[in-house]
Amino acid sequence: MDTLLEHEAADLYDEQQIDRIGDAVTGDAGDDSDDTLEDGQQLLGVNRQMDILLDAPQEPPMAVFPARGGPNGGPPRLRKKRSFYTMVKPTPPCQSREPEMCRLMASVTRAMRQVREDQRGEYFANYLVENMTSQNYPNGVGLPQHWGQF
């Protein structure tokens, strides 16, 4: 263990002596500011290269691999994978924009358009009582059987 410490101490002394000799040769008298500046610039260069690598995209651009179909030729790639549930699907033109409803509700809404807004609630109830009869809808045909069914 002592030999290891002596060896390290000798290396440190040799490095200091070499540094002093280098200072004497260059004439800067122990001022190592130029060396630290170069080391700092070199360190900044390494960090900048690392920053560039970290900011780079995870896969190479498609122009590097023209056989896969980059911008030069082939089908364009999708920019982003999308969920099946969030994609917009075109609706067929035969479907109307109005919500689906039974005949009774359709005739109620049609009739309510002719009534003033402050009387619509009362008119709605009276219309249902008058028109939701077995005479108008025999055996309940045309009426919803349960909530949510049209």
Curated annotation (Swiss-Prot):
Fetch the InterPro entries from UniProt: Soti
Q: Which keywords belong to this entry?
A: Developmental protein, Differentiation, Glycoprotein, Spermatogenesis
Q: Which residues are glycosylated?
A: 131
Region annotated Disordered, chain positions: 60-84
Pfam families in alphabetical order:
SOTI (PF17079)
Q: Which domain of life is it from?
A: Eukaryota
Q: Name one GO biological process term.
A: sperm individualization
Functional note: Post-meiotically transcribed gene that has a role in late spermiogenesis; required for actin cone progression during spermatid individualization.
Family membership noted in the UniProt record: Belongs to the male-specific scotti family.
- This protein's name: Male-specific protein scotti
Q: Which gene encodes it?
A: soti
